[in-house]
């Protein structure tokens, strides 16, 4: 009988030890899963930081010329104005005009190499993202909300707006006001 009680105690102790070992194994497995999850998150965070840094460097390279290009735009505007206000037939101005044309072409070619493109929207529909309306003018010849005149060209640098085009936008002609005689 004493042996049976000892055997029962040993069995109970072994069962309790097995239960303790099973709980310990489960606890360790949970800790392992948490550690794996934490390491995966750390790797993902590192990849995100690396990707963001690469994107920031790419943007810095892409738009590093933004201020410099913006400072050159008035020079281009001045050259274009000089050509617009000079006569190609005037012999005294002809050589100077040719020089200004060549200088302007060199400027434009250089800017194209750096992905700076002009926006000259004459006759196109008004686009508030790329155009700045300076005035509205009635016109029966073109669709309403079309660009009638361009005061100043706009420019895009790598597809991003550097300067909006300043434009005159058409509007539908208003109906003539009836005269006093017609109202009566």
From Swiss-Prot:
SUPFAM superfamilies for the chain: Coiled-coil domain of nucleotide exchange factor GrpE, Head domain of nucleotide exchange factor GrpE
Main location: cytoplasm
UniProt entry keywords in alphabetical sequence: Chaperone, Cytoplasm, Stress response
Subcellular compartments: Cytoplasm
Keyword Cytoplasm: yes
GO MF entry, a single one: unfolded protein binding
Similarity annotation: Belongs to the GrpE family.
Complexes and interactors: Homodimer.
Protein's recorded name: Protein GrpE
Protein's organism: Pseudomonas putida (strain W619)
